[in-house]
Structures are given as structure tokens and as C-alpha cells.
């Protein structure tokens, strides 16, 4: 998933850069391609509920909107998105106000409605529910589990990787450092995330904080 999202942003850079060198502006054409991707994603969703193309087509508009920014601003925006700003706000709000309740999306009801028709409905009924309740369930799950912010961040990082030429052989050492740093960061974060329920009982703090640390959430069970 992460590799696919990075490559989505990277491929945008390649196309945009090639067109820019020819004196063309690729942004409007890419927006049109996102619309086509949205349509293709819905065709796919007619038969497979958990597809990601619709999410990519919606989040993908961040690329033409930011591609003319300087590298430092793109990197800063990507980092902001990676820390899950909305769940982080919920954590701070819940810490300051014990009565605050994290807003919830009825994800479970969307899935239940979808599975009920998939189990007992005919072909046309299944297509209909997949395109409505099924898509709402899929997008709600992505929202509950931080995938919207994360996907946008990975798109931006993929574009930035293209700008910096980090996929070239001479930058192999950079990826070795990234791997080492990721391994070092993973274990304490994973351990901290697993210990949180033992110390935090307020779900309005626990759920978004777990999302910020590990991109895991039990919100879909609500």
C-alpha cells in the first residue's frame, strides 16, 4: 500500500516534469485523468468493495494543487499529514475537556448494509449497494484508520522523491539510512501503542492517539 502510494506521486512527477520540459502544463490533464480514475474505480467497486482507486482519485488532487510549491513546503505539508492532524487535535481537545467525545462515522452500519445485500441480494442489488453503501463503508474505513491523511502524505513524498532523484543508484545509501531509522523507530512506537490501553481509559483520547502512533483504530467497530 505505502509503495503504491509513493509510486503514484512519483509517476505524477515524471509526467509533470516531462511535460514541463516541453513547455506544457500537465496539471489540467492530470485532473482529467483523476476523473477517469474515479470512474474506473467505481466500475471496480461494483464487484469489489474494498478497492482504493476512488480514494486515490479524490486524494490525488493534492498533487496538481501543490506541485509548484518549493520542496521545503511540500516536505512540511507531508510531515503534517503524516502525524494525523485531525486525530491529534482530538487528543488535545479530549485532554483539555473530559466531556469531549470524538466524532464518529457510522462505518459499521455501512458495512452491515453492504454485507446484508451481498449475502442475500440479486446481481443488480449487489451492484447498487457496492456503489453506494459499499463505497461509503470503504471511504469511512479509510478515514477511521488515517488512510486519507497518510495517502496524501505519501503522494507528496513520492513527488518529492522524484524531484530529488532519490531512486537513482547514487542515493542507495539514503534508503539504507531510512530503513535503519524506520526499524529503530518501529519497536518503541509499537510497544508504546500496545501499552496505551493499560494507561488510558478514555476512548476519546485512546482511539485518535493510537491512530497517530500506529495508524490503528477501533473506530470501525463503533
Task: Please tell me what each predicted stretch does.
Residues 80-157:
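Long hydrophobic alpha-helical segments that form multi-pass transmembrane helix bundles
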Residues 197-209:
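Membrane-interface interhelical connector segments
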Residues 5-10, 151-159:
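Hydrophobic cores of alpha-helical transmembrane segments in multi-pass inner/ER membrane proteins
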Residues 1-47, 53:
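Membrane helical hairpin/interfacial module
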Residues 62-77, 160-181:
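Solvent-exposed interhelical
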Residues 215-222:
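Conserved small/polar residues in nucleotide/adenosyl-binding loops
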Residues 38-45, 82-90, 184-193:
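Aromatic-anchored segments of alpha-helical transmembrane domains
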Amino acid at each position: 500500500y505505502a509503495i503504491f502510494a509513493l509510486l503514484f506521486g512519483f509517476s505524477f512527477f515524471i509526467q509533470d516534469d516531462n511535460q514541463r520540459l516541453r513547455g506544457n502544463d500537465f496539471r489540467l490533464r492530470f485532473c482529467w485523468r483523476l476523473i477517469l480514475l474515479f470512474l474506473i474505480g467505481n466500475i471496480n467497486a461494483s464487484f469489489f468493495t474494498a478497492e482504493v482507486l476512488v480514494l486515490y482519485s479524490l486524494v490525488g488532487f493534492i498533487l496538481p494543487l501543490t506541485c509548484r510549491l518549493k520542496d521545503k513546503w511540500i516536505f512540511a505539508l507531508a510531515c503534517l499529514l503524516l502525524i494525523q492532524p485531525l486525530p491529534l487535535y482530538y487528543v488535545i481537545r479530549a485532554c483539555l475537556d473530559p466531556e469531549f467525545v470524538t466524532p464518529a462515522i457510522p462505518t459499521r452500519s455501512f458495512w452491515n448494509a453492504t454485507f446484508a445485500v451481498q449475502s442475500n441480494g440479486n446481481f443488480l442489488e449487489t451492484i447498487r449497494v457496492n456503489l453506494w453503501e459499499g463505497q461509503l463503508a470503504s471511504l469511512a474505513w479509510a478515514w477511521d484508520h488515517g488512510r486519507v491523511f497518510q495517502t496524501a502524505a505519501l503522494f507528496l513524498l513520492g513527488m518529492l522523491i522524484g524531484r530529488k532523484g532519490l531512486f537513482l543508484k547514487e542515493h542507495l545509501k539514503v534508503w539504507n539510512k531510512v530503513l535503519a531509522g524506520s526499524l529503530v523507530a518501529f519497536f518503541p512506537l509499537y510497544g508504546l501503542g500496545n501499552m496505551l490501553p493499560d494507561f488510558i481509559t478514555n476512548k476519546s483520547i485512546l482511539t485518535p492517539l493510537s491512530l497517530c502512533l500506529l495508524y490503528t483504530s477501533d473506530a470501525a467497530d463503533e
